[in-house]
């Protein structure tokens, strides 16, 4: 495992922990898209169904368990524990427009037409657009809390580092995964506008807002 992959995993883990702490400490999930979190739970479930059949390393297994557990814990807090604070009126993105096309694409474009491989491919495609309901919600409300901005920024850094990970692997290992790279590029592009606003506003102590 190279440094970019490791730092990407740490950034991803930091994003998840920031979100969980934000919800738990404030006793509120206001400003958080439950739909995005459900999509992420679907992503990790589909991707890591090989948990009991494909052992790579203790690190790999632990990260899989943490991602699945944290994603479902987040969904539980939003839709059960702190349901009264969930802003469903602004979380209105039509997720079927994300799930159905990515599922169809996974059947059509994959590395191997087997159940686990199709599910893995589906998770890669879906993850690339899973943040859209959250960005749509921020755009609709006009602003985001600072901690939510930190969460989104950490996710964006994770995806950017993973792109460097693919470049590293291609250069030093000769490994090239076009599906993962293209999906990663799509996801990184979605964060570009947010990165600019984060750097120009949040890091200067201002509140983040996206164009409506």
Curated annotation (Swiss-Prot):
Q: Where is this site: Interaction with the K-D-E-L motif on target proteins?
A: 5, 117
Show the segment(s) annotated as Interaction with the K-D-E-L motif on target proteins: 47-48, 159-169
Q: Where is this region: Important for recycling of cargo proteins with the sequence motif K-D-E-L from the Golgi to the endoplasmic reticulum?
A: 204-207
Chain ranges on the Lumenal side, renumbered to this chain: 1-4, 53-58, 111-116, 169-178
- PTM notes: Phosphorylation by PKA at Ser-209 is required for endoplasmic reticulum retention function.
Localization, per the record, is: Golgi apparatus membrane; Cytoplasmic vesicle, COPI-coated vesicle membrane; Endoplasmic reticulum membrane; Endoplasmic reticulum-Golgi intermediate compartment membrane
Provide the positions where the record notes the PTM Phosphoserine. Answer: 209
Taken from the record's topology, the Cytoplasmic segments are 25-32, 80-92, 136-149, 200-212
Membrane topology of this protein: Multi-pass membrane protein
Among Pfam families, the record links this protein to: ER_lumen_recept
> What are the recorded Gene Ontology BP terms?
protein retention in ER lumen; protein transport; retrograde vesicle-mediated transport, Golgi to endoplasmic reticulum
Molecular function per GO: ER retention sequence binding; KDEL sequence binding
Asked if Phosphoprotein is a keyword of the record, the answer is yes
Annotated positions for site Important for recycling of cargo proteins with the sequence motif K-D-E-L from the Golgi to the endoplasmic reticulum: 193
Keywords assigned by UniProt, alphabetized = Cytoplasmic vesicle, Endoplasmic reticulum, ER-Golgi transport, Golgi apparatus, Membrane, Phosphoprotein, Protein transport, Receptor, Transmembrane, Transmembrane helix, Transport
Q: Name one GO cellular component term.
A: endoplasmic reticulum
Major location category of this protein? Golgi
Transmembrane ranges, per UniProt, are: 5-24, 33-52, 59-79, 93-110, 117-135, 150-168, 179-199
Cysteines joined through disulfide linkages: none
Q: Quaternary form?
A: Upon ligand binding the receptor oligomerizes and interacts with components of the transport machinery such as ARFGAP1 and ARF1.
Q: What does this protein do?
A: Receptor for the C-terminal sequence motif K-D-E-L that is present on endoplasmic reticulum resident proteins and that mediates their recycling from the Golgi back to the endoplasmic reticulum.
**PANTHER family with a match to the protein in the record:** ER LUMEN PROTEIN RETAINING RECEPTOR
Q: Which family does it belong to?
A: Belongs to the ERD2 family.
Instruction: Report the protein name in the record.
Output: ER lumen protein-retaining receptor 1
Organism placement in taxonomy: Eukaryota, Metazoa, Chordata, Craniata, Vertebrata
Which gene is annotated as encoding this protein in its UniProt record?
KDELR1
């Amino acid at each position: 495992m190279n440094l970019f992959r490791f730092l990407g995993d740490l950034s991803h883990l930091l994003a998840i922990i920031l979100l969980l702490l934000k919800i738990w400490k404030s006793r509120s999930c206001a400003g958080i898209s439950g739909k995005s979190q459900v999509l992420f739970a679907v992503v990790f479930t589909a991707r890591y169904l090989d948990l009991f059949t494909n052992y790579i390393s203790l690190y790999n297994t632990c990260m899989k368990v943490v991602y699945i557990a944290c994603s479902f814990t987040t969904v539980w807090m939003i839709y059960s524990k702190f349901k009264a604070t969930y802003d469903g009126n602004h979380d209105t993105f039509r997720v079927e427009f994300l799930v159905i096309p990515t599922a169809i694409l996974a059947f059509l474009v994959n590395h191997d037409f087997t159940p686990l491989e199709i599910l893995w491919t589906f998770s890669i495609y879906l993850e690339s657009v899973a943040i859209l309901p959250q960005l749509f919600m921020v755009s609709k409300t006009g602003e985001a809390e600072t901690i939510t901005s930190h969460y989104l920024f950490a996710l964006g850094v994770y995806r950017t580092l993973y792109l460097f990970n693919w470049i590293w692997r291609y250069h030093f290992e000769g490994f090239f995964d076009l599906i993962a790279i293209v999906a990663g590029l799509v996801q990184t592009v979605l964060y570009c506008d947010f990165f600019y606003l984060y750097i120009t506003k949040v890091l200067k102590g201002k509140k983040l807002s996206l164009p409506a």
